[in-house]
Regions:
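Intrinsic disorder/low-complexity segments enriched in polar/small residues
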Residues: 3-6, 83, 97, 151
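Sec-dependent N-terminal signal peptides of Gram-positive bacterial secreted proteins and lipoproteins
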Residues: 1-25
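Generic hydrophobic, helix-prone segments enriched in Leu/Val/Ile
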Residues: 102, 127-129, 152
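Extracellular adhesion/glycan-binding regions together with long Ser/Thr-
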Residues: 137-165
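N-terminal small/polar-rich segments of proteins
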Residues: 24-124, 160-202
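A surface/secretory-pathway sequence property marking extracellular, secreted
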Residues: 108-146
Length: 202
């Protein structure tokens, strides 16, 4: 079997070598001293053959929200989340980024562009939360503090190296539910963050 494999590999190598050598279809002679050769090549339409995998959270859970007794101070509920560049191949890190954007599922440019969780049994009960691309929300601004200017969402992070991880925070101010009849707003809430990734120049 080893001998057969060796012969097969040798023949395959010979065929590959032959396919890469130019074919002599014309000759120059003392009576015909000029000739032409067509030079051919192919450029792939794939943009640099870049491939990547950005891993986003499946679920982010605030857990149990508690109605505060007063709203004289903030009552934040924070939960961390991660977005990771699991794989990056072929990216020119000196000139290119993989940019990740995020928006609420119902957000629109020029319209309502904040992030919300909504009561699963009552679509009229929605409460806003904030998205940070840092683990220090007290010393930075939420990405949704400004208006959303692109349909793909707010710019969240730029990746150029495989393995890079962005850890951020979702923040819910429990003052949002202060003053409500708790029996009227009780229940399960959910919302969806829509992520978008694209290769862009730095």
């Amino acid at each position: 079997m080893k001998a057969k494999k060796l012969v097969t590999l040798t023949l395959a190598a010979a065929m590959v070598a032959a396919s890469s050598v130019s074919v002599f279809a014309a000759e120059l002679t003392d009576t015909d001293s000029t000739g032409q050769t067509e030079v051919k090549a192919h450029i792939s339409g794939n943009a640099g053959n870049v491939s990547y995998i950005i891993t986003i959270p499946d679920v982010i859970d605030f857990g149990e929200l508690t109605q505060p007794e007063d709203n004289s101070t903030d009552h934040f509920k924070d939960v961390n989340y991660e977005v990771k560049a699991t794989k990056i191949d072929g990216l020119d890190a000196s000139t290119q980024n993989i940019n990740v954007y995020v928006r609420d599922q119902n957000a629109s440019v020029g319209g309502v562009d904040d992030f919300f969780i909504t009561n699963k049994n009552n679509a009229n009960l929605s409460f806003e939360y904030s998205v940070f691309n840092t683990t220090n929300p007290d010393s930075s601004s939420a990405i949704n503090d400004n208006n959303m200017l692109q349909t793909v969402g707010y710019h969240l992070f730029s990746f150029d190296t495989e393995g890079d991880t962005m850890t951020g925070v979702l923040r819910f101010n429990q003052n949002n539910i202060y003053g409500y009849d708790i029996t009227q707003i009780a229940g399960d809430y959910s919302g969806h963050m829509v992520f978008f990734s694209t290769i862009e120049n730095k």
